């Protein structure tokens, strides 16, 4: 058997973030077929626990999960525009990878550095959406981010995408060079070892006990939303749904901003409960005990939370928009227009009346697609096609 090809993943977020978890998924997908390495671009913001122990040079560490880990440090991603370059070149020359795989376009400024350090290596960029590029046209921060950090993304040799919708949007924004480059939609995996249905379906009594345990008393059911406070997430519609159904508890997981606090207070939404964050096991229990996952986002590059909820045995209702439509059409109810709060509320009524709103066959097909097995096959298929 010949030597395995080397692949180096480059990520700037820790393993508790979505990009960090995705990097670990990619390492898991390839480590049996490739000599796998990861370069963590570390900053105090995303690796605070390691700041005191950081070393002046990258010291490779063999991880028990089957890969070699390297690291370089900067004070922030922005200072890393200069500070990451030289130490990253050093790592690249030491590893001499056949493939350099960047986890997100915000690291595009490093693509030319990788090409300079390893001219024969193929560079791959994972594109997740174009929100940073298109949603904030008047923001100086995002203008600079696009100009200096993201634009060089088009210099990569090939691209992978989380959805067909993202691929289309990226082609429109980045233009012909990306559109004509080799590429593949590889999706995103869910952690099926964590997000799965209990052995026995959760009973109505168990749901009520769970609500009481978490401070939600005298409600007929519970809805769940997991999201950032961004305009594209359409949280206002979720809160309007709460106003329409005051006898149901509406849980939101995410930062409780001043804007959201004002909406809750102005509408006197005593049935809205906020949790800033959960650990993974806590989130699974909320998924399992909710009556309905509500995901009214206008724009999503993929949309994992409703898929995770369905994997846990809980129905979802989503907006018929962007990649959510691509993934969930035919699986669960989709609402259009996305801000029709009454339409979401009617789906809730059907569920509380005992109706099944999920197509079981379509859901199984979706969960198979989002399994690590399916994800690994697509990643490896793409890499093998690149030679």
Task: Give the residues covered by each predicted segment.
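Nucleotide-activated donor-binding/catalytic signature segment of Leloir-type glycosyltransferases, i.e.
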Residues: 260-284
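Membrane-proximal helix-turn-helix segments that form the acceptor-binding/catalytic region
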Residues: 89, 141-159
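Short alpha-helical donor nucleotide-sugar binding micro-motif in glycosyltransferases
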Residues: 285-290
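Short hydrophobic beta-strand element within catalytic cores of glycosyltransferases
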Residues: 315-318
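Conserved acidic donor-binding segment of nucleotide-sugar-dependent glycosyltransferases
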Residues: 333-342, 349-355
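Active-site proximal beta-strand in glycosyltransferases
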Residues: 99-101, 114-135
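Aromatic "clamp/platform" in nucleotide-sugar-dependent glycosyltransferases that forms part
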Residues: 298
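Conserved donor-binding/catalytic core segment of Leloir-type glycosyltransferases
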Residues: 8, 216-233, 242
């Amino acid at each position: 058997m010949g030597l395995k090809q080397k692949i180096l993943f480059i990520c700037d977020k820790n393993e508790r973030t979505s990009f960090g978890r995705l990097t670990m998924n990619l390492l898991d997908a390839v480590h049996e077929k490739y000599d796998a390495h990861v370069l963590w671009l570390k900053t105090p913001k995303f690796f605070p626990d390691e700041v005191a122990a950081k070393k002046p040079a990258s010291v490779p560490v063999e991880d028990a999960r089957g890969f070699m880990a390297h690291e370089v440090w900067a004070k922030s991603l922005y200072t890393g525009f200069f500070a990451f370059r030289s130490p990253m070149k050093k790592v690249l020359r030491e590893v001499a990878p056949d493939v350099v795989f960047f986890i997100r376009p915000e690291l595009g400024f490093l693509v030319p550095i990788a090409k300079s350090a390893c001219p024969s290596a193929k560079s791959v960029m994972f594109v997740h959406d174009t929100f940073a590029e298109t949603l904030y046209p008047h923001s100086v921060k995002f203008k600079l981010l696009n100009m200096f950090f993201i634009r060089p993304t088009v210099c990569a040799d090939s691209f992978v995408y989380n959805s067909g919708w993202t691929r289309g949007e990226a082609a429109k924004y980045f233009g012909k060079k990306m559109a004509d480059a080799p590429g593949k939609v590889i999706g995103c995996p869910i952690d099926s070892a964590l997000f799965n249905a209990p052995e026995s379906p959760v009973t109505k009594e168990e749901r009520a006990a769970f609500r009481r345990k978490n401070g939600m008393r005298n409600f007929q059911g519970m809805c769940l939303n997991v999201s950032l406070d961004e305009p594209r997430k359409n949280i206002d519609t979720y809160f309007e749904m709460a106003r329409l159904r005051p006898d149901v508890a509406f849980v939101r997981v995410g930062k409780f901003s001043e804007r959201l606090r004002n909406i809750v207070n102005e509408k006197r939404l005593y049935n809205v409960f906020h949790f800033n964050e959960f650990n993974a096991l806590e989130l699974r229990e909320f998924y399992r005990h909710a009556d309905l996952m509500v995901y009214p986002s206008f724009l999503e590059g993929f949309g994992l939370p409703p898929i995770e909820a369905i994997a846990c045995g809980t129905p979802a209702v989503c907006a018929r928009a962007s990649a959510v439509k691509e993934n969930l059409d035919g699986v669960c109810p989709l609402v259009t227009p996305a801000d029709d709060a009454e339409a979401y509320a009617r789906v809730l009524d059907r569920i509380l009346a005992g109706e099944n709103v999920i197509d079981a066959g379509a859901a199984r097909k979706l969960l198979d697609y989002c399994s690590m097995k399916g994800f690994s096959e697509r990643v490896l298929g793409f890499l093998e096609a690149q030679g």
